[in-house]
């Protein structure tokens, strides 16, 4: 360690829990200030923890290249244990976690079947829409992406046994990610109480489905989904290996990142297209041309829509699903001449890095053409274009989330015209929880398209 400089501290945070209250109300404002005052490496106080925020290519590269044994993820997210349950993914050791997350449903050959499944789910959701009406984006996309995620990642059989209660409980669970978890994830506050009740509700729903599966085991292999497999596993004494509580935890962990990514990004993609009618028209025309011959939504077709692809990338840059990624240092390190000590929290912020003006000119503008040759700003800035992280820590579900969103819009934009039902600037994110969600109201109007 040759570092001699001390990591600079950002201004503010004189209260008992340091910058916690500001982090709960305006996290992006706080992190912006860290970069403005301290540069690529600076720290803020989160309850009793110092969080060293890294930004810019060099510091981010260190963050994303580090292994779990160097910068540990599980320790950095105390809110995950009450949501997932003990021993599931975030509590598991890195090898077990890699094995659990390398779910077959996310492999290439399975992705091909998912496109058709997602198209069917979208059509099911909109079959009662009629000629025109209004939807709340958060409500619609949160429910739709619960069904698409469960159908693709767990199985259609399980999906077909769900109703809107599953989506409602799941939404409440995501709201239980208040940064107060850095003081104590079991504090007696309302959002944590609701979180625990919602999780118990999910366990009950899964338990009911499990009872049915035990009473009526699958006839053959083609009738089995992931739940059947988990229910059939026995321990050495011949008893069921997993409880409903554990299986619910596995399902939550499987869907957690993918669901809120797909739900929030779908909402923001539509909002940004509505704010920029010329791009909306371009994307719609591209879809009309692609599907003009009546082909179904397929994995193959979804690889041929560059305008929608670019609009989606730009939406992800401006509205990343996670605004901060955290780890805990397991050793002593040096980054850009600054020391990082064992036990300190280290963070990277997609919300900050994605808008560095030197890398992304006019960073606040929605400009999908940034991804066209020769600019290709996502490829040139591989350590600062980080809506899904980067390097070995790139989100495991990134390809699935992007494919899912493209499949959703392949149906919606061909069947309906959309328009804003409130002022363009009134659509905002709610940053009061670690899982960012759209602030309500977030309504749009739709009317069925008239075909020539």
UniProtKB/Swiss-Prot annotation:
Residues 1-20 are annotated as: Disordered. Heme b binds at residues 73, 77, 327, 393, 395. It is found in: Cytoplasm. Signal peptide: none annotated. It catalyses: a 14alpha-methyl steroid + 6 reduced [2Fe-2S]-[ferredoxin] + 3 O2 + 5 H(+) = a Delta(14) steroid + formate + 6 oxidized [2Fe-2S]-[ferredoxin] + 4 H2O. One of its GO terms (biological process) is sterol biosynthetic process. Gene3D superfamilies: Cytochrome P450 (1.10.630.10). Keywords: Cytoplasm, Heme, Iron, Lipid biosynthesis, Lipid metabolism, Metal-binding, Monooxygenase, Oxidoreductase, Steroid biosynthesis, Steroid metabolism, Sterol biosynthesis, Sterol metabolism. Belongs to the cytochrome P450 family. This is Sterol 14alpha-demethylase.
């Amino acid at each position: 360690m040759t570092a001699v400089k001390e990591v600079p501290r950002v201004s503010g945070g004189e209260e008992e829990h340091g910058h916690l209250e500001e982090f709960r109300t305006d996290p992006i404002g706080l992190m912006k200030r860290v970069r403005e005052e301290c540069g690529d490496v600076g720290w803020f106080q989160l309850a009793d923890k110092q969080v060293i925020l890294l930004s810019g290519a060099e510091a981010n590269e260190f963050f994303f290249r580090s292994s779990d044994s160097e910068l540990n993820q599980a320790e950095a997210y105390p809110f995950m244990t009450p949501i997932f349950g003990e021993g599931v993914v975030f509590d598991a050791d890195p090898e077990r976690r890699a094995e659990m997350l390398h779910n077959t449903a996310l492999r290439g050959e399975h992705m091909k079947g998912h496109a058709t499944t997602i198209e069917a789910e979208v059509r099911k959701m909109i079959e009662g829409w009629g000629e025109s009406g209004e939807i709340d984006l958060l409500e619609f996309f949160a429910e739709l992406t619960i069904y698409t995620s469960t159908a693709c990642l767990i199985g259609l059989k399980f999906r077909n046994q769900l109703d809107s209660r599953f989506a409602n409980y799941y939404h409440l669970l995501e709201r239980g990610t208040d940064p107060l978890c850095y003081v104590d994830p079991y504090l007696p506050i309302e959002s944590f109480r609701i979180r625990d009740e919602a999780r118990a509700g999910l366990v009950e729903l899964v338990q009911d489905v499990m009872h049915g599966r035990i009473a009526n085991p699958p006839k053959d292999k083609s009738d089995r989904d992931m739940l059947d497999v988990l229910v059939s596993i026995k321990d050495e004494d011949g008893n069921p290996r997993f409880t409903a509580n554990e299986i619910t935890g596995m399902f939550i962990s499987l869907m957690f990142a993918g669901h809120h990514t797909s739900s929030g990004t779908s909402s923001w993609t539509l909002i940004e297209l509505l704010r920029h009618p010329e791009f909306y028209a371009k994307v719609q025309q591209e879809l009309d041309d692609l599907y003009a011959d009546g082909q179904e939504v397929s994995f193959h077709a979804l690889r041929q829509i560059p305008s929608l692809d670019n609009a989606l990338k730009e939406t992800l840059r401006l509205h990343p699903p996670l605004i901060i990624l955290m780890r805990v240092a397991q050793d002593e390190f040096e980054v850009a001449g600054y020391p990082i000590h064992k036990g300190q929290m280290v963070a990277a912020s997609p919300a900050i890095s994605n808008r560095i003006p030197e890398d992304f000119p006019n960073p606040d503008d929605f400009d999908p053409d940034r991804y066209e040759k020769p600019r290709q700003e996502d490829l040139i800035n591989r350590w600062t274009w980080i809506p899904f992280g980067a390097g070995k820590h790139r989100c495991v579900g990134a390809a699935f989330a992007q494919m899912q969103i493209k499949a959703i819009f392949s149906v919606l934009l061909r069947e309906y015209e959309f328009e804003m039902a409130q002022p363009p600037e009134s659509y905002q994110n709610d940053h009061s929880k670690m899982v960012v969600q759209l602030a309500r109201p977030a309504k749009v109007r739709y009317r069925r398209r008239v075909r020539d």
